[in-house]
Amino acid sequence: MNPNRSVAVDKVVVHMGVGEAGDKLVNAERIISEITGNTPVRSVAKQTLPAFGIRKGAPISCRVTLRGEAAEKFLETSIKIVENKINSRAFDKQGNFSFGIEEHTDYPGQSYDPKVGIFGLDVTVVLKRNGVRIARRHIQQKKLPLKQLVTVEDAKLFLKDRYNVEVQ
């Protein structure tokens, strides 16, 4: 197989939305940094939602972006937690996919603490092929050929071959 046609993991984004600032967000940041080993970044609300008590610009969630070997290792652990099954509706047109994990206590080394509670998290995986750099570089930037884009079928085949995942 042509090495430029092979699919690889570009990045894994781990997101915890808590809906409010304060102790709950601080606890979520601590948990996400323990699980991933990286420092989280806070995300702010894009609009005001009075029904939920959220103001525009208020920090309401945190996320971590993993790349390289750390992303692959975290993805393996996360896929085992969801029992090697991903819904077919989890894929977008570019071959990226997302899935949720209901309890952070499913990860190794995490235990339930009544003071903290239980947090769920979202895992988003972005896939790429070699040669994507020509579309992202600043000097002599080119359009990416359509055959170089990752399709949904390519992503499903990659998951089946690499991580033994069943797409439902």
From Swiss-Prot:
The organism's place on the tree of life at top rank: Archaea
Keywords from the named record: Ribonucleoprotein, Ribosomal protein, RNA-binding, rRNA-binding, tRNA-binding
SUPFAM superfamilies per the UniProt record, alphabetical: RL5-like
GO CC aspect terms: ribonucleoprotein complex; ribosome
GO terms for biological process, alphabetical: translation
NCBIfam families per the UniProt record, alphabetical: PRK04219.1
The family this protein is said to belong to: Belongs to the universal ribosomal protein uL5 family.
Function: This is one of the proteins that bind and probably mediate the attachment of the 5S RNA into the large ribosomal subunit, where it forms part of the central protuberance. In the 70S ribosome it contacts protein S13 of the 30S subunit (bridge B1b), connecting the 2 subunits; this bridge is implicated in subunit movement. May contact the P site tRNA; the 5S rRNA and some of its associated proteins might help stabilize positioning of ribosome-bound tRNAs.
Protein name: Large ribosomal subunit protein uL5
